[in-house]
C-alpha cells in the first residue's frame, strides 16, 4: 500500500471517530432526532444555554379580543361647531305689553299751507271767552259733586258736606253759596253732634262753620244773618278774641266752638236744604 493511501485512510478514520464522538455528545442522529445513548454506561449532560437568536419577523394580526370593561368618564370635550339651523317651530303665545319706546326723531316740516280767509274774530273771541268761563264753572261743579258722592251727612231737612279744600272764611262762604248752600249752621245739639262726628271720622281737627261777629264784636250771627240765640257750644274760655282779629268760628273735632281769624285757610262744612217733594 502506498504511503499516500495510508494517509487518506488515516484521515477518513479520524473523521469517522470525530463524527461518532459528536453523535455521542449531542445525542442526535443523522435526521436530527433524539437517539439513545451509544454507551449506556455514560450520562450525557445538556450543554450551556446558547445566545439569544435574532428577532423573528412580525407575525400575522391575531383575532379580535373580547370587549373590555367600560372605562372611566373622560374629560369634557371642546365645544363643537355651530350646527345647521333647525326647522321653524310653532308660534308661541303673545308676550306681555312692552315698555314705551323712546321718542322718535321729529319729522320733516310740512309744506306751508294756503292763506286763510280774513275773519272778524272779535265776536267769536267773546263767545269763546264766555264758554271758557262756563266750562271752568262746570268743571268745578263736577269736582264738587264727585267729592259729595264720596261721603255726606244728613238730617231730616238738610245735607252736610265737608269740603277738603283749604279756604279762608269768605272764600268758603262763597264756595257753598255758589252751589246752592251756605256754611253749616249748627243751631241745636243734635246737629252739632252730627257735625262733630263728621269732622272726627274724616280725620280732621277743625273746620269752619257759618258763624261770625264781623259786623259787631261780641255779637255772633249765623251765615243766614240770624242771631246766635238758644244754643251754643263754646270751648272753655272762648270766645276771647286773643289777637283782636278772631271774628270767625271753627268747630273742633270734639264739637266745641272756637273763635278764629277769618284769614286762616282750613277745610269747611257746607249745608244744603233738602228739596220738598
From Swiss-Prot:
Biased composition annotated in UniProt, kind: Basic and acidic residues: 49-63
Cell compartment(s), UniProt: Secreted; Golgi apparatus; Cytoplasm
Signal peptide residues on this chain, from the entry's feature table: 1-27
Entry superkingdom: Eukaryota
Family annotation (SUPFAM superfamilies): C-type lectin-like (SSF56436)
Disulfide partners: 176-270, 248-262
Coiled-coil parts of chain: none
Tissue expression: Widely expressed. Highly expressed in lung. Weakly expressed in larynx, syrinx and cranial air sac. Expressed throughout the lower gastrointestinal tract in increasing levels starting from a faint signal in duodenum and ending with relatively high signals in proctodeum, coprodeum and urodeum. In the upper part of the gastrointestinal tract, expressed in tongue, crop, and mucosa of the crop.
InterPro entries referenced in this protein's UniProt entry, alphabetically: C-type_lectin-like, C-type_lectin-like/link_sf, C-type_lectin_CS, CLec_Tetranectin-domain, Collagen, Collectin_CTLD, CTDL_fold
Low complexity bias (residue ranges): 64-79
Record GO terms (molecular function): D-mannose binding
Main location: secreted
Region (Disordered): 41-82
Function statement: Lectin that binds to various sugars: galactose > mannose = fucose > N-acetylglucosamine > N-acetylgalactosamine. Acts as a chemoattractant, probably involved in the regulation of cell migration.
Homology family: Belongs to the COLEC10/COLEC11 family.
Protein name in UniProt: Collectin-10
Organism per entry: Gallus gallus
Lineage: Eukaryota, Metazoa, Chordata, Craniata, Vertebrata
Amino acid at each position: 500500500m502506498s504511503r499516500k493511501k495510508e494517509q487518506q485512510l488515516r484521515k477518513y478514520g479520524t473523521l469517522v471517530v470525530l463524527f461518532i464522538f459528536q453523535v455521542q455528545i449531542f445525542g442526535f442522529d443523522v435526521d436530527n432526532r433524539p437517539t439513545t445513548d451509544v454507551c449506556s454506561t455514560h450520562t450525557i449532560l445538556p450543554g450551556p444555554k446558547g445566545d439569544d437568536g435574532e428577532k423573528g419577523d412580525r407575525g400575522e394580526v391575531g383575532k379580535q379580543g373580547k370587549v373590555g370593561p367600560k372605562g372611566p368618564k373622560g374629560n369634557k370635550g371642546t365645544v363643537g361647531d355651530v350646527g345647521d339651523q333647525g326647522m321653524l317651530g310653532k308660534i308661541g303665545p303673545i308676550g306681555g305689553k312692552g315698555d314705551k319706546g323712546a321718542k322718535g326723531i321729529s319729522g320733516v316740516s310740512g309744506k306751508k299751507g294756503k292763506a286763510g280767509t280774513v275773519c272778524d274774530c272779535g265776536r267769536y273771541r267773546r263767545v269763546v271767552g264766555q264758554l271758557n268761563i262756563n266750562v271752568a264753572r262746570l268743571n268745578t261743579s263736577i269736582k264738587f259733586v264727585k267729592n259729595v258722592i264720596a261721603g255726606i251727612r244728613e238730617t231730616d231737612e238738610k245735607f252736610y258736606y265737608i269740603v277738603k279744600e283749604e279756604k279762608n272764611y269768605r272764600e268758603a262762604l262763597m264756595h257753598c253759596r255758589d252751589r246752592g248752600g251756605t256754611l253749616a249752621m249748627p243751631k241745636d245739639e243734635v246737629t252739632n253732634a252730627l257735625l262733630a262726628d263728621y269732622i272726627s271720622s274724616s280725620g280732621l281737627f277743625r273746620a269752619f262753620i257759618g258763624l261770625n261777629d264781623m259786623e259787631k264784636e261780641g255779637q255772633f250771627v249765623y251765615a243766614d244773618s240770624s242771631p246766635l240765640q238758644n244754643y251754643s257750644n263754646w270751648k272753655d274760655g272762648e270766645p276771647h278774641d286773643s289777637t283782636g282779629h278772631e271774628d270767625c268760628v271753627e268747630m273742633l273735632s270734639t264739637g266745641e266752638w272756637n273763635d278764629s281769624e277769618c284769614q286762616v285757610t282750613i277745610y269747611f262744612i257746607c249745608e244744603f236744604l233738602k228739596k220738598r217733594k
